[in-house]
Amino acid sequence: MPGLYATPTAPLPFLPGVVVRSFVLQRGTESTLIYNSPGIDAAADEIRALGEPSHLLMNHWHEAMYGPPKLQVPALVHQDDRAHTEASLPVDGTFTARGWIGKDLDLEVIPTPGHTAGVTTFLWDSGEHRFLFSGDSIWVQGGQWKVVVLGDSNRADYLNSLALMRELDFGVLVPWGAEAGAPCFDVVTRGQARQRIDALIERVAAGSAE
């Protein structure tokens, strides 16, 4: 899609058949990275060609398992995930509330705790599409939207965050992980997004982990 670029993939160690990647948002004369993954260094030259990256925006601390990229870029994560992140990856700044990245008001930071305490979703308006970077909070498996409720996840927070995401205006869901060989994003209408998130809310409220 215009303005959105995906890095090469890397396997998710604890979930066979699932890969992760980072995304590059071309925003004027600079670029912004979403999600940490080995793909950043694999595509370092291509990323620089799109404009020197201003930030690496991390959805949650699990992304730190791959360590810091060699590409020099300030890493930001939510304050509530900072301690876990810094065990593996230096943090240059934190989010604490809903707000914007940069002056153009095109990239919004939206805390959506649940999967971890500091999960942060990013909503980007490219001018042509509205992308929701949902991390692991919502991903696609077998063509179906799913959640990832872990043993240490907060189910009540997760439900509140799903309700918040249901009201966001977006047309492209972009998770961190995807099945190997499957598309890395899902294009939907606003009605479809609401319907699918309603189904997630129902399942999580009933005790489902996915």
Could you describe each region identified by the protein language model?
Residues 2, 6-9, 14-15, 30-33, ...:
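Metallo-beta-lactamase
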Residues 14-16, 38, 92-94, 155-156:
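Short gly/ser/thr-rich secondary-structure transition/capping motifs
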Residues 14-20, 42-43:
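Short N-terminal binding/cap micro-motifs at the start of the first secondary-structure element
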Residues 17-19, 95, 116-118:
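Residues that act as N-cap/strand-start positions at coil-to-secondary-structure junctions
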Residues 18, 102-105:
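Short, solvent-exposed coil/turn segments
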Residues 22-26:
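Short, surface-exposed beta-strand/loop micro-motifs that present aromatic residues
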Residues 27, 36-39:
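Conserved beta-strand-loop surface patch within small alpha/beta domains used
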Residues 38-103, 192-203:
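Active-site HxH/HxHxD metal-binding segment of metal-dependent hydrolases
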